[in-house]
């Protein structure tokens, strides 16, 4: 039988900007240290950014699962929770406080819940929660966003597509994250010579930005089924012409990867017509943003999809791709599985702890096999559960995987 391990919890209050705000939910940055009675092999610093809406709920559940899987693999985590997004706006007036950015950059990995909400929709652009996300991605220099879209056999009936179309879908979308139209200059709103308001943005990519995301995509495809589809709009956009030129040039370095190209409008159609044709997709920032959300509905729910944002060095940022869902916040209705699977990606891609990651992935499948479903993936014959209970079931499944 597996040995029983005791867990000792020690709460550390770290002095900081928020330590005097005792009446707020972010009373102070804190670390929860879980020390096993048996020797610990490795220790990691993890920054938690609960954010807004359902973010705190799903982060709480995912943290417990991450903690359990790590503990069973001899890992120790120091968790530091920091304000971010709308919560930070309410607390200190900016979506990304300097202390939050510093904590993130000094950690081994960051796990984010969700940001945004109706409350801040009318704020000036620089005071919206979403700007915090764009800025932290830049601060961390995470340029590669990996978004898996897999239709699990247990959830094939939840897909919006016919069963025969959705069954067996397993793709990875590699999205460039820090360039393109979201960051390009010039941008703005001005008045033209006719006195009419004009809004404009710039889609711009340098060769090195394309090369580095293409290499990530080729390496990803090489570890999967060896097929890479580059999505662009090279029949219209100059930035896409350069994109296709650079990706094609790099293909000679990866003779074992089959490269194809597709225009983004066709790719959007093919994703719902025949999604199984795709293995790995690489595309720019705005196209990736749109296509990955489209792919999420193939899987049955946006609440199932994790993501990893990685750079050449430094900590990665891991988050579910769903939003903050303020309409169900605080009601225990959120699906925590995307955040739990983001924690698995944190272990795998951020820390290189593949065994612990596999424990979490297997536990999610196990909980689904037992019929547990949150409302977004529920179908008759299964057991409807809330966010907390789904997390508890995954925890039980992780615990059952302890080696004997």
Swiss-Prot record:
Give the regulation of activity: Regulated by a thiol-based redox modification.
Could you tell me which Gene3D superfamilies the record lists for this protein?
A: Isopropylmalate Dehydrogenase (3.40.718.10)
Provide the residue positions that the database annotates as binding Mg(2+): 265, 289, 293
Q: Which residues does this entry assign to the site Essential for redox regulation?
A: 229, 387
**Positions marked as site (Important for catalysis):** 182, 233
Report, from the record, the phenotype seen after gene disruption. Answer: No discernible vegetative or reproductive phenotypes, but decreased leucine biosynthetic enzyme activities and lower free leucine concentrations.
Residues bound to substrate are: 137, 147, 175, 265
Q: How is the cofactor bound?
A: Binds 1 Mg(2+) or Mn(2+) ion per subunit.
User: What Pfam families does UniProt report for this protein, alphabetically?
Assistant: Iso_dh (PF00180)
GO annotation, cellular component aspect:
chloroplast; chloroplast stroma; cytosol; plastid; thylakoid
Free-text tissue specificity from the UniProt record? Mostly expressed constitutively at high levels in seedlings, cotyledons, hypocotyls, flowers, pollen and leaves and, to a lower extent, in roots and stems.
**What InterPro entries does the annotation carry?**
IsoCit/isopropylmalate_DH_CS, IsoPropMal-DH-like_dom, Isopropylmalate_DH
Task: Tell me the route in metabolism or biology where this protein functions.
Answer: Amino-acid biosynthesis; L-leucine biosynthesis; L-leucine from 3-methyl-2-oxobutanoate: step 3/4
Q: Which GO terms describe its biological process?
A: L-leucine biosynthetic process
Please name the PROSITE patterns in this protein's record.
IDH_IMDH (PS00470)
Q: Where in the cell is it found?
A: Plastid, Chloroplast stroma
Instruction: Quickly give the catalysed reaction.
Output: (2R,3S)-3-isopropylmalate + NAD(+) = 4-methyl-2-oxopentanoate + CO2 + NADH
Q: Transit peptide: which residues?
A: 1-34
NCBIfam families in the cross-refs = leuB
> How does it associate, per the subunit comment?
Homodimer.
The text of the family note is:
Belongs to the isocitrate and isopropylmalate dehydrogenases family.
Chain's role: Involved in leucine biosynthesis; catalyzes the oxidative decarboxylation step in leucine biosynthesis (primary metabolism). Catalyzes the oxidation of 3-carboxy-2-hydroxy-4-methylpentanoate (3-isopropylmalate, 3-IPM) to 3-carboxy-4-methyl-2-oxopentanoate. The product decarboxylates to 4-methyl-2 oxopentanoate.
Q: What is this protein called?
A: 3-isopropylmalate dehydrogenase 3, chloroplastic
What species was this sequence derived from? Arabidopsis thaliana
* Name of the gene: IMDH3
């Amino acid at each position: 039988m597996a040995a029983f391990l005791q867990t000792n919890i020690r709460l550390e209050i770290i002095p900081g900007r928020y330590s005097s705000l005792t009446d707020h939910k972010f009373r102070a940055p804190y670390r929860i240290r879980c020390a096993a009675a048996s020797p610990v092999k490795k220790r990691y610093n993890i920054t938690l950014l609960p954010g807004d809406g359902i973010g705190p709920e799903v982060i709480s559940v995912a943290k417990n699962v991450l903690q359990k899987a790590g503990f069973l693999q001899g890992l120790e985590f120091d968790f530091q929770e920091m304000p971010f997004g709308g919560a930070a706006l309410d607390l200190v007036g900016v979506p990304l406080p300097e202390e939050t950015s510093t904590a993130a950059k000094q950690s081994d990995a960051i796990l984010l819940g969700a940001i945004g909400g109706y409350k801040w929709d009318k704020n000036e652009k620089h005071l919206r929660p979403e700007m915090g996300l764009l800025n932290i991605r830049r601060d961390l220099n995470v340029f590669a966003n990996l978004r898996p879209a897999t239709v699990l056999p247990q959830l094939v009936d939840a897909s919006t597509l016919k069963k025969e179309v959705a069954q067996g879908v397993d793709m990875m979308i590699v999205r460039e994250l820090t360039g393109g139209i979201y960051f390009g200059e010039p941008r703005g709103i001005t008045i033209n010579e006719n006195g009419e308001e004009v809004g404009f943005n710039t889609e711009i990519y340098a060769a090195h930005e394309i090369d580095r995301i293409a290499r990530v995509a080729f390496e990803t495809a090489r570890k999967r089924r060896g097929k890479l589809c580059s999505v662009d709009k090279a029949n219209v956009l100059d930035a896409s012409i350069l994109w296709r030129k650079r990706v094609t040039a790099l293909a000679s370095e990866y003779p074992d990867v089959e490269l194809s190209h597709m225009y983004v409008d066709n790719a959007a159609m093919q994703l719902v017509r025949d999604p199984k044709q795709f293995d790995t997709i690489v595309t720019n920032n705005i196209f990736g943003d749109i296509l990955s959300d489209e792919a999420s509905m193939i899987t049955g729910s946006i609440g199932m999809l994790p993501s990893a944002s990685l750079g050449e060095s430094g900590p990665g940022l891991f988050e579910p791709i769903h939003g903050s869902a303020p309409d169900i916040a605080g009601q225990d209705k959120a699906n925590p599985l995307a955040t739990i699977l983001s924690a698995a990606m944190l272990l795998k891609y951020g820390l290189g702890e593949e065994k612990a990651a596999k424990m979490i992935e297997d536990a999610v499948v196990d909980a689904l096999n037992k019929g547990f479903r949150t409302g977004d993936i529920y179908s008759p014959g299964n057991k409807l559960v809330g966010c907390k209970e789904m997390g508890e079931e995954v925890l039980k499944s992780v615990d059952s995987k302890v080696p004997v």
